[in-house]
Amino acid sequence: KIPLTEKSELLWIPVVVNGKSYDFILDTGASFTMISQDLAKDMGATIIGDPVFVGGGESTGGYGQRAFIENMNVGPVSLKNVIAFVSENPTDDDPLKVDAVLGMDFIERAGEIQIDLAAMTLIIPAQTTALPASGRNIILETNIPVVESTDANGNRYTFILDTGASGANLSDLWFAKNAEVAAALPVETQNVWGHGGTVQLEIVKVPEFKLTIGTSSAEFKDLPATVPANGTVSSSRDGRLGMGLLKQFSKVIFNFEDMFVAFE
C-alpha cells in the first residue's frame, strides 16, 4: 500500500529517486511521466535529445525535453531507465504549481492499480482483479484510458478517464450531439489550465447529468460543457472524467490487463 495525499483536489503519490522522495500527481490523463526543469536538476536526471511537443489536457500543450532517470521507485515497484518529459518550471499563474506528474507509462506497467479513496492509499495487487461480468469497458488511446458509458436516457458516450483533472466536463462533441438542450443554456466563460498555460473556453453548465459505467452510476450537478468554437467540433470524445467522478466512490480499480475500470 502506497500512501496518497490530496492537494488542490488531486491525488499525489511519493516517488523515490536516488534515495530522495518527491510528490508526483497520479495522472491517468498523461501519456508520460513529466518533471519540471528544476526537479530534473535536483534529481540528477540526464537531459537527452531535442525538445518534443507534449499535449496538455484542455490547453494548447507545449514543448519539453526528455530526461533519463536511472532508477525510480513507486512503493514496491522499481523502474529502471525511465524516460520522462521535462516541462518548463511552473509559472506564477499556474494554480497547482505542478512540477511532477506520474503518467500512464508507469501506471500501465503496474498492470492494475486500486485507488482506495476511503483509506487514501494506492494498492498494486499481487493478483489482479477478475474481469467483472459487465466486461471490458476501456481502451487506450495515445496511451490514455477512454471509458464507455451510458447516460440516463441510454445514450452511449466515451470519456477520457483523467485522474489528473480535479472535476469532470463535457466536450464540444457532447454539446454538438445534444445541441437542442445545450444551446438553450446560458453561455459562460471559463479558464482551463493545462500543460502550456491557460485557455479561455465558452461553456454552458448542464444542471444535472447522470451516467453509468459498468454497473456503477454517478451523478453530476452543473457539469460544464464546452461550446464548439466558431461552430467547429475539435474533440473526438464526449468529455473528461476526473476526480469529480472518482470521489463519488470509496475505491476505483484500473485494470490494464483485462482493460476495465470498476468502482466500489
Locations of regions flagged by a protein language model:
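Pepsin/retropepsin-fold aspartyl endopeptidases
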Residues: 1-264
